[in-house]
Every structure is written in C-alpha cells, then in structure tokens.
C-alpha cells in the first residue's frame, strides 16, 4: 500500500493528468480550426459536455488539493505519517474515482456515486485533521 508521500505524488500526478488531457483536447480544437486560440473559458463553456466536465473535474482536484494535500504535507513535515499512511492511498483512490465518474456520466446514480467518493475523502480528511491536532497539541 502507498504511504503518504507516494499518495501525495499520485494526487499531484492525477491532477496534472487531467490538465494535460484538457490541453491536448483544446490543442486539437485549435489545430483543426474549430476554436480560436483565444476562444476558451476556464470552464470550457460552449464546448462539448465532456470538456466542460473535464474542466470541472480538474478544478475539483485543484480546489481540494490545499486541504487534502496540506494535511499530508503537515503529516510529513511533523513526522506524523503514522496518522495518514493507512488511508492515504484510499483518499487518492476515492479522488480518482470521483473524477472518473464525473467524466463518464451525469446520471443520478453516477452523481450519487461521485458524492460517495467525495464523502470518503471528507471523512478521511476530518479524521486526519482531528488526529494530527491531537498529536501536535
């Protein structure tokens, strides 16, 4: 099982992978003349629903990285990875599941699964925050 540092690296890599995919697809649109180079908005408004979901999935990762990544970095910096190691890979797997579900479907069952994956991340982060506070105070 991955510990905290490899899981944090995986979180960064997943976020970067979503960004790279988005830029590959945007580049293709520009190169084929479908969209001018200055024709993109941050949310990919006016583009395909998939590209809009991809932008949102990437932004979800970026928005959550300070909280989840911050807790992992705190554990690493304070030598308290015993708190985060057991669930670090689970958190990243839940993040990848949430993003993947977001990309493939917007059906009600998919949204419910996506929320469940996010709830797993929130529960883990809350546990980590509580445990780290107890260990550091």
Predicted segments with their positions:
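Helix-boundary and loop/linker segments of multi-pass membrane transporters
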Residues: 1, 41-46, 77
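N-terminal signal-anchor transmembrane alpha helix
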Residues: 2-40
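Hydrophobic residues within alpha-helical transmembrane segments
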Residues: 10-13, 58, 89-93, 116
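A loop-to-helix transmembrane entry motif
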Residues: 50-65, 86
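Core segments of transmembrane alpha-helices
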Residues: 59-73, 125
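Short alpha-helical packing/oligomerization segments
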Residues: 70-93
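Interfacial loop-to-transmembrane junctions
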Residues: 97-123
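Juxtamembrane boundary at the C-terminal end of a transmembrane helix
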Residues: 126-137
